[in-house]
């Protein structure tokens, strides 16, 4: 970064190290400003302190070293006082504070903003230090400023309390006011829930010297139990804040209640402790800004479909596996929402699909109604585009940080809500009915704000010019007086030219002298007697008059009074709006839900999605299903649809497990993800990319698609694969959907085949999970001849004399070739390598005995649900004695 020319750069001194820590200095020798800096820093030792000095926010000592490194700023030094020498210093311009603060917070730091809280001219006149105070404490989980937040993503702050195997979790997005808590007894479930939420910051209580320290992602600490992923940012908080009594009292006081029974957490002590500790942290970091949180809601993790981190990653729900980008994810493909709050809601829905068929059908009914009524759908979507992010706007209003533009945007949106209610008045589906009754007071409130504020208010409130004329009589009178003086100044130059006869006389202004009259030096002798000389320049003389200074004082006084009065009027208006924050946020939740469903109806129409029938039992019956992302990437008509039938149950001879074989790069992994995404979309309440679909609810989706070395934990690709597979076998049920791709490939062939066979057999006979098992071990096709609930499918190809054509069609039957050498040819391997590979493969196929005898003497077995191991008859197929 290149600093502005007026930034106080000085070369570091060579006699003393400017990078010293302040704790090793004699503070009495520091200048008064540095003494105050150190005093503030000791109050916030775990935050980076940005300290206002003129037009810059500066930092010193070790904070300067850290910030210069993280932000790539110039590290310089500044005189610290007699006998101290120079101290390390860097800084940022005041107008760039938000940008640089955001960068530091994104890197996992807490940032304390120490700003001037009085006019510097008053302090200068009294020859004292300008009064400064901490005005903001920014941490990763407590951001509210629009410029620091991702409009389409929640910024969650979480708190965790753990006792043995039991845990409590609370989380909130203070920019929207959402506040939830839960309690459970499985530490693995805690890790899954944190992985779903992806909180920006997690509070964890300890009783140790590291209190209030923030651990950046990846930073290790003995204070954190192994069950907590180290990929998050943790703030270590005092245990005393998280005691049950302290936490319960804080919740009762905050919500002005006598009991927590209405919140549903009365008998969940760990959930209460987590919620109370989180509340305390919000109060501590937000200072004078009271965050208007929504009522605390208690939920159970058993209410939703479980998606572990591996599944979310493999299904590419919010970001791609390859580069972590939004483009190419499921969310990218289906997010047609018109508002930021709708986009956030869609993300939450995708990461927390429903298990309740009634909730799913309620969403489907609304999508169906909007799909069948294109005019209504388009009118709703057009009206939604006119509505701002009222969820976060109401939060800033409630916290007292909203500016005039924020308030005007909120007001305009409140007025539009009445139009939206009118549009859905005839709706019959649940989510349309929810918006038919919008409080009339909200529209009146919006109209009141619009009537008070000018159409294009300035960004900063203290610039004035915010309130319309005719709102306040005193304000109008001050403005008239001010305008009279301004008009006098406008006419002064003409008047003085006529009075003096000096045609090149000018009336000007600067910050040093204020208003003055300028004459060329050649005309100085003609200056009237009432002109008082103030400054002589090379070609110019500058004068003032008694009347001019009197008028100037009137202007300065009037501006100050005007700005103060306008700010009072605006603040009062903002307080009135803040009283309606709960009602506004309740409506915002309904608007966001309607936005999501209208967007899903839109994509259902234009991408040809069908309404899935939510069936009882364990059924997955999809006809001509498509991958929602790949089909959009390829364009209309290019994607090859495929069907699937899974879920063996009475009256249906569908398999529980499909062995899927086929060539490399033929589309097996795409097919696996396609089935998983259709199941997920169905339980989100969305329509799905298929000709028709009949789908039962599943409790979990497991995926194991591809693996890489985990260098951080020293695990090989194969070990990562085995850990993921073990997790599936230990947690899957007959209501789960399991999608496996190439189990056992990271070890010797016999070992890999043995593991793959055993895993598939266990899934089919013991767990009876609905499973697609993609593999290049063609020997696994023999399972279908052994187990009644296993079927073979293959991704077909067309063989030509010198090449193969991928048809991307999934058909019954097992493949006996993987065409890996042909894939190598397509990738550009040298011809000599391809030819040699063909020779080697011929020899291997000729002499291999892996598959000999697999069909001999095997009677087809009907699996029986059991907690025991598969029968010996199933395992005896490898017995040499047979």
Swiss-Prot record:
InterPro entries: DNA_mismatch_repair_MutS (IPR005748), DNA_mismatch_repair_MutS-lik_N (IPR007695), DNA_mismatch_repair_MutS/MSH (IPR017261), DNA_mismatch_repair_MutS_C (IPR000432), DNA_mismatch_repair_MutS_clamp (IPR007861), DNA_mismatch_repair_MutS_core (IPR007696), DNA_mismatch_repair_MutS_N (IPR016151), DNA_mismatch_repair_MutS_sf (IPR036187). GO terms for molecular function: ATP binding; ATP-dependent DNA damage sensor activity; damaged DNA binding; mismatched DNA binding. Keywords: ATP-binding, DNA damage, DNA repair, DNA-binding, Nucleotide-binding. One of its GO terms (biological process) is mismatch repair. It comes from the Bacteria. It comes from Microcystis aeruginosa (strain NIES-843 / IAM M-2473). This is DNA mismatch repair protein MutS. The keyword DNA damage applies. SUPFAM superfamilies: DNA repair protein MutS, domain I, DNA repair protein MutS, domain II, DNA repair protein MutS, domain III, P-loop containing nucleoside triphosphate hydrolases. ATP binds at residues 662-669. SMART domains: MUTSac (SM00534), MUTSd (SM00533). Residues 1-22 are annotated as: Disordered. This protein is involved in the repair of mismatches in DNA. It is possible that it carries out the mismatch recognition step. This protein has a weak ATPase activity. The keyword Oxidoreductase does not apply. PANTHER family: DNA MISMATCH REPAIR PROTEIN MSH1, MITOCHONDRIAL, DNA MISMATCH REPAIR PROTEIN MUTS FAMILY MEMBER. GO terms for cellular component: cytosol. Belongs to the DNA mismatch repair MutS family.
């Amino acid at each position: 970064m290149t600093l502005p020319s007026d930034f106080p750069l000085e070369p570091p001194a060579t006699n003393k190290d400017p990078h010293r820590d302040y704790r090793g200095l004699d503070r009495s020798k520091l200048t008064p400003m540095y003494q105050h800096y150190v005093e503030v820093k000791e109050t916030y030792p775990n935050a980076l302190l940005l300290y206002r000095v003129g037009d810059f926010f500066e930092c010193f000592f070790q904070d300067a070293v850290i910030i210069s490194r993280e932000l790539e700023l110039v590290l310089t030094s500044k005189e610290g006082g007699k006998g101290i020498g120079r101290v390390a210093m860097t800084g940022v311009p005041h107008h760039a504070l938000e940008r640089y603060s955001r960068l530091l917070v994104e890197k996992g730091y807490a940032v304390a903003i120490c700003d001037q809280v009085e006019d510097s001219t008053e302090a200068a006149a009294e020859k004292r230090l300008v009064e400064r105070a901490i005005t903001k404490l920014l941490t990763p989980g407590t951001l509210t400023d629009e410029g620091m937040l991702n409009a389409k993503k929640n910024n969650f702050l979480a708190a965790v309390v753990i006792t043995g195997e039991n845990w409590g979790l609370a989380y909130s997005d203070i920019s929207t006011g959402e506040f939830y808590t839960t309690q459970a007894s499985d530490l693995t479930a805690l890790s899954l829930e944190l992985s779903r939420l992806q909180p920006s910051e997690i509070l964890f209580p300890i009783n140790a010297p590291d209190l209030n320290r923030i651990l950046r992602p990846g930073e290790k600490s003995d204070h954190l139990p192994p069950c907590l992923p180290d990929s998050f940012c943790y703030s270590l908080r005092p245990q005393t804040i998280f005691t049950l009594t302290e936490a319960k009292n804080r919740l009762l006081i905050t919500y002005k209640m006598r009991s927590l029974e209405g919140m549903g957490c009365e008998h969940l002590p760990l959930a209460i402790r987590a919620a109370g500790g989180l509340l305390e942290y919000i109060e501590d970091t937000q200072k004078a800004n009271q965050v208007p949180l929504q009522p605390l809601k208690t939920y159970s993790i058993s209410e939703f479909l479980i998606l572990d981190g591996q599944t979310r990653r493999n299904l590419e729900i919010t970001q791609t596996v390859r580069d972590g980008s939004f483009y190419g994810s499921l969310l990218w493909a289906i997010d047609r929402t018109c508002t930021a709050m709708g986009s956030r809601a869609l993300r939450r829905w995708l990461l927390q699909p429903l298990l309740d068929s009634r909730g799913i059908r309620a969403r489907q009914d609304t999508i169906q109604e909007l799909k069948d009524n294109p005019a209504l759908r388009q009118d709703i979507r057009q009206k939604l585009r006119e509505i701002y992010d009222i969820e976060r706007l109401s939060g800033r209003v409630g916290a007292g940080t909203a500016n005039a533009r924020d308030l005007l945007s909120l007001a305009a949106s409140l007025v539009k809500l009445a139009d939206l209610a009118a549009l859905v008045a005839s709706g019959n589906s649940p989510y349309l009915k929810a918006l038919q009754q919008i409080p009339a007071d909200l529209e009146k409130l919006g109209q009141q704000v619009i009537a008070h504020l000018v159409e294009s208010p300035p960004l900063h409130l203290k610039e004035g010019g915010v309130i319309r004329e005719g709102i306040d009589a005193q304000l109008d009178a001050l403005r008239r007086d001010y305008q009279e003086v301004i008009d006098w100044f406008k006419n002064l130059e003409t008047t003085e030219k006529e009075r003096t006869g000096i045609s090149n006389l000018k009336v000007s202004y600067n910050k040093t002298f204020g208003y003055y009259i300028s004459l060329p030096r050649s005309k100085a002798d003609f200056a009237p007697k009432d002109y008082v000389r103030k400054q002589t320049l090379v070609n110019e003389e500058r004068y003032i008059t008694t009347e001019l200074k009197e008028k100037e004082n009137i202007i300065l006084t009037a501006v100050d009074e005007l700005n103060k009065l306008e700010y009072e009027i605006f603040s009062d208006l903002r307080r009135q709006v803040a009283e309606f924050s709960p009602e506004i946020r309740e409506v915002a939740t309904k608007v966001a839900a309607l936005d999501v469903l209208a967007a899903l109806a839109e994509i259902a129409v234009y991408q040809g999605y069908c309404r899935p029938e939510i069936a009882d039992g364990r059924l997955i019956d999809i006809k001509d299903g498509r991958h929602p992302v790949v089909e959009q990437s390829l364009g209309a008509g290019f994607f090859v649809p495929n069907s699937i039938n899974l879920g063996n149950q009475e009256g249906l001879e569908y398999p529980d497990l499909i062995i899927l074989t086929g060539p490399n790069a033929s589309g097996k992994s795409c097919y696996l993800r396609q089935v998983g995404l259709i199941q997920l979309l169905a339980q989100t309440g969305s329509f799905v990319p298929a000709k028709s679909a009949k789908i039962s609810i599943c409790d979990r989706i497991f995926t194991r698609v591809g693996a890489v070395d985990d260098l951080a934990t020293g695990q090989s690709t194969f070990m990562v694969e085995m850990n993921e597979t073990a997790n599936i076998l230990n947690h899957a049920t007959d209501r789960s959907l399991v999608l496996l791709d190439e189990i056992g490939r990271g070890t010797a062939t016999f070992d890999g085949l043995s593991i793959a066979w055993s895993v598939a057999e266990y899934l089919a006979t013991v767990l009876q999970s609905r499973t697609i098992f993609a593999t290049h071990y063609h020997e696994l096709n023999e399972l279908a001849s052994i187990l009644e609930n296993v079927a073979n499918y293959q991704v077909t190809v067309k063989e030509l004399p010198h090449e193969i054509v991928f048809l991307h069609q999934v058909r019954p039957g097992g493949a006996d070739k993987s065409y890996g050498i042909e894939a190598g040819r397509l990738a550009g391997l040298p011809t000599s390598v391809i030819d040699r590979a063909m020779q080697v493969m011929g020899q291997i196929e000729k002499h291999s005995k892996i598959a000999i005898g697999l069909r001999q003497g095997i009677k087809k077995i009907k699996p029986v649900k059991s907690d025991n191991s598969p029968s010996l008859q199933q395992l005896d197929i490898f017995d040499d004695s047979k």
